[in-house]
Amino acid sequence: MNQSYFPHHQSDLSLQRVEAALDALRAGQGVLVTDDEQRENEGDLIFAAQSLTREQVAMLIRECSGIVCLCLTDEAVRRLDLPLMVSDNSSRYQTAFTVSIEAAEGVTTGVSAADRLTTIRAAIADDAGPLCLSRPGHVFPLRARPGGVLERRGHTEATVDLMRLAGLKPCGVLCELTNPDGSMARMPEIVAFSRKHGFPLITVEELVQYRIVREQPAALLQAEAESAGALCSA
């Protein structure tokens, strides 16, 4: 973990950072999420898919790697009938890419910011189905694990978890932040980018702790209620 930037003893501040990220997403703004230094050691710029703008897609293309990914739940992936990109995933962190997609209508080459936005909107529409999309394309869906960051500490799961916690559609767009020379941005550059653009910055581990703190009391209350109900019916 990037402990020099986010000491574990600052748990209250960590929770506040996650809350700030959720507020930003609700307001249609972006957030930055970093993972462990021993994992991918990268920062992803993340936007809510439901409020995504052409300008935000252009920023992902300009400031990041340009590989714009749409993070979806397993249910959404099945509804869109998107098979995984490969049947035998041998990537180090088991990132669950599906086949790439394009909107079936309303796009030209599919690669422009406007076209990629059209594709994303087509994929997340309430009535979206397999016929709304062509395959392959220039947007890369990622399937999140059902348990979110508690099951897999990845940016895909962090994105979907953040959207759910913010009360938004459980789908978001991410792209890895890069430096002007094309190299991957590391923590000093990610922090500088966050400050320059006013994007809240959190770690995956902070999101894990946020979920544990927020969900554990609810789970205990439910268990107590179930126990009390069992005693009453005994």
UniProtKB/Swiss-Prot annotation:
Q: Name one GO cellular component term.
A: cytosol
Pathway it belongs to?
Answer: Cofactor biosynthesis; riboflavin biosynthesis; 2-hydroxy-3-oxobutyl phosphate from D-ribulose 5-phosphate: step 1/1
Reactions catalysed, as given in the entry: D-ribulose 5-phosphate = (2S)-2-hydroxy-3-oxobutyl phosphate + formate + H(+)
Protein's GO biological process:
riboflavin biosynthetic process
Which keywords fit this entry according to its UniProt record? Lyase, Magnesium, Manganese, Metal-binding, Riboflavin biosynthesis
Top-level class of the enzyme under EC nomenclature? lyase
Residues binding Mg(2+) 1, per UniProt: E40
UniProt-listed Gene3D superfamilies: DHBP synthase
Give its E.C. classification number. 4.1.99.12
What does the Swiss-Prot or TrEMBL cofactor note state?
Binds 2 divalent metal cations per subunit. Magnesium or manganese.
| Recorded superkingdom | Bacteria
Pfam families found in the cross-reference section: DHBP_synthase
Q: Which HAMAP family match?
A: RibB
What's this protein's family per the entry?
Answer: Belongs to the DHBP synthase family.
Q: What name is this protein filed under?
A: 3,4-dihydroxy-2-butanone 4-phosphate synthase
